[in-house]
Amino acid sequence: EPFMTDTSPAKAASAEKAAEANADAATPSKSYRRYVLVVLTLVYSLNFIDRQILVILQESIKVDMDLSDSQLGLLTGFAFAIFYVTAGIPIARWADRGNRRNIVSLSLFIWSFMTALSGLAQNYSQLLAARIGVGIGEAGGSPPSHSMISDYFPAEQRGTALSFYSTGIYIGILIGFAAGGWIAETFGWRVAFFLVGVPGIFYALLLVWVVKEP
């Protein structure tokens, strides 16, 4: 007899069930997806805390370093924005091909380290360089985070997940203005940079251990 492949309905059904079981095993649980979403939202909050802190501290820095309005404007606006924009595109392309969790972690480490380093600046040029570093680091936060959230959540839940992630903006602004002003008034602007930047450095290292690349 010629060789015949067994294509019986029972075997086909068994294969389909096995495939579904493998797919379910590979799909993260609902609780883990929510957990990752909270972790990435906290990263986004740190992004905006570090971004807003200079706005809060600018008057103290202006007096301490004897800066002109044009120097202050460059420090708080253009220097950050131009590097944030130009670095964002290549980092997003990198995220399409690389490990997105590691990119988020590295970006968080860079901008947090540069924020803390701002507290050591002895002149305008050093502070400007540190803020440029913050801009480059923060450019790598959102693109890979959006991509990870899109992979973790099915299409029907993605809009809600991304909306939750966006609350990190307002959480960061709220904490930045509330805590930053008090710290600056109590301890000075240099300490404020340290206290805002250092937690992000440790959080960046922790992120590698607590989040899986989807």
Roles of regions detected by a PLM:
Residues 86-125:
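Conserved MFS/SLC helix-loop-helix module at the cytosolic interface between two early adjacent transmembrane helices
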Residues 55-86:
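Extracellular/periplasmic helix-loop-helix junction of adjacent transmembrane segments
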Residues 165, 169-213:
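Helix-loop-helix hairpin linking two adjacent transmembrane segments in secondary transporters
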Residues 5-49:
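Cytosolic juxtamembrane N-terminal segment immediately preceding the first transmembrane helix
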Residues 60, 89-93, 182:
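Membrane-interface helix termini in secondary transporters
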Residues 130-170:
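Cytoplasmic helix-loop-helix junction between adjacent transmembrane helices
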Residues 66, 99, 120-126, 137, ...:
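Helix-breaking motifs and short loop linkers at transmembrane-helix boundaries and internal kinks
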Residues 52, 80-89, 139, 173-174:
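Residue-level signature of mid-helix packing/kink "hotspots" within the transmembrane helices
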